[in-house]
Amino acid sequence: MTAPIVVKIGGRALDEAASRGPLWNALASLAREHAGGVVIVHGGGAAVDAHLVRLGMFTARAEGLRITPPEQMDEVAAVLAGRVNTLLVGLLLAAGVNAVGLRLGDAGAARCDLHRRAGTDLGRVGEVIGGEGGAWRALLRAGCTPVLSSIGFDERGSALNVNADDAAAAVARILRAHALVLLTDVPGVRGQDGGTIVELDAARAESLIDAGVITGGMIPKARAAVATAEATGVPTVIASWDAPEHLRNLAHDAPVGTRFTAGARSAPRVSLASDGHG
């Protein structure tokens, strides 16, 4: 079976989901044209923040991860696996995608445990520690597109809040994906001539940072993409949700955004998180 493409959606693409028709249509085309199908992993940090504010609950973060006290876990799961997942599945169905909404840990496809970080109590924040992805593979074989919220379960069956970027990387690793696509507000890394750089590895990315070509907010994005490619063994693509018509190029191995590959030298290991879950 051809390996699937894993697409992570978050940020403004979700905050303005109802007005993103071209994006959902492009994902429908990609799912039809790529023989291995597509798996979508989504965040929803802004929706969680707004919900917790309405409830008078405080949100704290540590190094990009949303600290999730046990008393907030049900609320976080209700928003991510309920409201956001339902909205996204509906929009994809309307675009012609055979979308099936799931939590990350459903059917044991991904095994999770509490996230271990020395000196910081993250509450019910989880991380993926293994899995076979059997349920996702079965759905892909049936012509369906799994749409995964980043809610996992520990060995006792209690819910865990997994960072969406980390969840997408884990899904790509488990499925040995053809590519992992991180949809952002930028089309990729710009070169000195203003054009998008097609491919980078750790060494070249760092040399462009040192030369002042990669600057500002693109520095953590580039380092995170390289780190993900090296950790998963899966090429990682930064592409824009504002140019979704190019996404179908992935089905034909044509350039889209900037593709990051594992190189001989590792970039600094930086969390993919930008807003906790978006």
Label each region the model flagged.
Residues 1-278:
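C-terminal catalytic "cap/lid" subdomain
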